[in-house]
Amino acid sequence: MNMKPNILSMEAYVPGRTIEGATKLSSNENPLGPSPLAMAAVKKALPEIHRYPDGTCIGLRAEIGGLWELDADSILVANGSDELLILLAAILIDPGCNAVGARQTFSQYRYAVRLFGGEMREKSLLSGLHDLSGMLELINSDTKVIFVCNPNNPTGTYRSSQELESFLREVPNNIVVALDEAYADFADAGDFPNSRTLLTEYPNLLILRTFSKIYGLAGLRIGYAVAQPEFIGAMAKAAMPFNVNSLAQVAARAALTDTGHREGTLRLVHTEKEFLGVELSKRGIFSYPTQANFICFALEQKISGIWEWIAGKGIALRELSSFGLPKMARYTLGSRVHNQLLLKILDELPTR
């Protein structure tokens, strides 16, 4: 049986895992759960699930467009950011083409590019940050897209508005810059980029957002892209019909209106990242300053060798060997009770 070698050579996605009895804090899910308004909207919509969903997602696109002060034709809703990445690669990548990104970042950029036979050219992080200058050096005549995850997954680090703009000015305007802002809702740094402003100045910019994190809808698989209408239209042509289910659409629309859930999530994340950052530092444990809903910290040994022990004590975190960071862990910021339990577990480690 002849199968495509580019598919056979791909590595399977490694998700965050857990075990029975442990609290799962390995996948950056919202510790408060889904928006109550979203749950109510899903319950109300259940009697209509025998009908096909709105294949254009026009209601949701219009509401997202209102938040961004853009027309709906600048918005594409899809079955999570993963599908958006595949649609992006579908319209840009052929065998012989390449994309540029960071090595220690979200693996689905690599997956989407290789799925269509392209080459992923990667630059290692520089002090935990995207090496933007180094990434520019990887561009050649076959480069179609550059991926920037800001804040970065799994480090939680970010490039500032000035740094990102300097980078965008150097990127040839025929190369798409895909700015993944899955965690941008959590960013509170004063110099964090305003991507809406950047869209006006850089027509080759595409922004990715998700409902999985701050809105707590990871199980419904829904995300969106913001870009020039011509680009959005091309991606829409590559999408499967009815790719976003009706429950995801109504939940997302309701979640957008739930300011109480959003504000509560932000309060928890901002309070607990400060608490945990200070406590890890007291213990001599290095962690990156985070602008996301997780914190990335380092131990003296490979996390894979102690993951089961930590999970057995009650916390399932993410070991980062698949990211090329075997001695680092990514921990979703949970409640104070969960975070204190993590610290207790770390205190009990024979060596850190």
Say what each PLM segment does.
Residues 270, 279-313, 329:
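Conserved PLP-binding catalytic core of the aspartate aminotransferase-like
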Residues 1-51:
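N-terminal "arm"/small-domain region of PLP-dependent enzymes with the aminotransferase-like
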Residues 162, 309-313, 317-318, 322-352:
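PLP-dependent enzyme catalytic core of the Aspartate aminotransferase-like
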Residues 91-148:
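PLP-dependent aminotransferase-like
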Residues 50-98:
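Phosphate-binding glycine-rich loop
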Residues 35, 204-288:
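PLP-dependent aminotransferase class I/II
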